[in-house]
């Protein structure tokens, strides 16, 4: 559905839907694709590129969009900035989807380590407000992250049904 550039409330609703969907899969993306996850959901602060200290990378991804639509929205100029931020995310998501060896990564041990890591991340970054400093959606996003973990665990429940004790 198209987004009306003069309707910030519609933009916020679409953002919330996209970010919630991302949070549901964050248990896997944060662990198996950390560089892409940082680009998609890193903090809305500039950072220095590790290879060349003289290159400053501006904020990008969901948190930069959050800052734009919840704090800095200007109907005349912000829509183009929003479109650029969102468009930059698309190839990263497409590359993650097409990643050739993605099915080899998901050993049981690594998936359970991803779950452990995700729970730590939710409790240290998610529910503290660091992950959604402007929109203040940290708790709903933490719930979405836990829903993603629950869905993942349901797969393992089917693979390893509980043993019945006699």
Predicted segments, located by residue:
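Mature extracytoplasmic or organellar-lumen-exposed domains after removal of signal/transit peptides
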Residues: 1-166
């Amino acid at each position: 559905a198209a987004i009306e550039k003069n309707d910030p409330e519609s933009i916020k609703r679409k953002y919330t839907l996209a970010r919630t969907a991302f949070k549901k899969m964050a248990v896997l993306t944060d662990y198996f694709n950390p560089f892409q996850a940082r680009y998609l959901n890193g903090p809305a602060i500039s950072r220095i590129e590790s290879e060349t200290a003289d290159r400053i990378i501006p904020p990008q991804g969901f948190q930069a969009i959050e800052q734009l639509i919840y704090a800095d929205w200007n109907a005349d100029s912000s829509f183009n900035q929003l479109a650029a931020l969102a468009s930059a995310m698309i190839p990263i998501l497409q590359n993650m989807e097409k990643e050739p060896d993605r099915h080899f990564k998901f050993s049981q041990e690594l998936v359970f380590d991803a779950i452990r890591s995700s729970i730590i991340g939710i409790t240290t970054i998610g529910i503290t407000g660091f992950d959604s400093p402007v929109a203040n959606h940290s708790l709903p996003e933490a719930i979405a992250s836990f829903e993603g973990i629950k869905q993942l665990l349901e797969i393992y429940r089917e693979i390893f049904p509980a043993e019945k004790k006699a």
